[in-house]
C-alpha cells in the first residue's frame, strides 16, 4: 500500500501491516473479523473520530474496514488496534461471499475483485 504525505501530497513508501482478506482481531475489544478494505490514513470525519475513536489512534497510519465475525456490521479500525488472529477458523458474516471467493484455512480469504 502507498500512503501520502498530506502536506505535500507525495507518495511515501509505507507498507500496511495487514492485507485485504486477512483475519484479524481487535486488540481492545477482542472481536475477530476480516479486512475488506484499507485506507492509507484516516478518512473519516473529525466528528466521527472525536465521538467514536476514544483512544485517539494515529490518523496518519493505515485504517481498515473490517467485517465483524458473528455480526452483520463492519468496523473502521486503526492499524494500531489490530492484531493478526491466531485462530484460523473462518469468519461468519453475511457479506463474506460478496467480497471473497474462498477461504484457504490458514487465516486468509481471496478477494473476488480488487476493491481498493
Q: Where on the chain are the PLM-derived regions?
A:
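Short proline/glycine-enriched turn/loop segments at secondary-structure junctions
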Residues: 51-57
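Short, solvent-exposed secondary-structure boundary/capping segments
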Residues: 42-51
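Aromatic side chains
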Residues: 18, 31, 48-49, 64, ...
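Structured beta-strand/turn binding interfaces of compact recognition modules in eukaryotic regulators
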Residues: 27, 36, 69
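Intrinsically disordered, low-complexity, charged/polar segments
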Residues: 57-116
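Mixed-charge, Lys/Arg-rich low-complexity intrinsically disordered regions
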Residues: 2-23, 29-32, 39-42, 113-116
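Short, glycine/acidic-enriched capping/hinge loops at junctions between secondary-structure elements
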Residues: 36-37, 46
Amino acid at each position: 500500500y502507498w500512503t501520502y504525505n498530506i502536506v505535500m501530497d507525495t507518495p511515501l513508501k509505507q507498507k500496511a501491516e495487514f492485507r485485504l482478506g486477512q483475519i484479524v482481531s481487535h486488540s481492545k475489544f477482542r472481536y475477530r473479523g476480516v479486512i475488506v478494505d484499507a485506507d492509507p490514513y484516516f478518512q473519516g470525519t473529525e466528528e466521527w473520530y472525536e465521538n467514536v475513536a476514544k483512544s485517539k489512534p494515529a490518523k496518519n497510519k493505515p485504517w481498515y474496514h473490517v467485517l465483524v465475525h458473528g455480526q452483520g456490521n463492519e468496523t473502521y479500525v486503526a492499524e494500531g488496534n489490530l492484531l493478526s488472529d491466531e485462530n484460523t477458523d473462518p469468519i461468519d458474516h453475511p457479506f463474506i461471499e460478496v467480497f471473497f471467493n474462498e477461504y484457504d484455512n490458514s487465516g486468509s480469504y481471496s478477494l473476488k475483485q480488487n476493491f481498493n
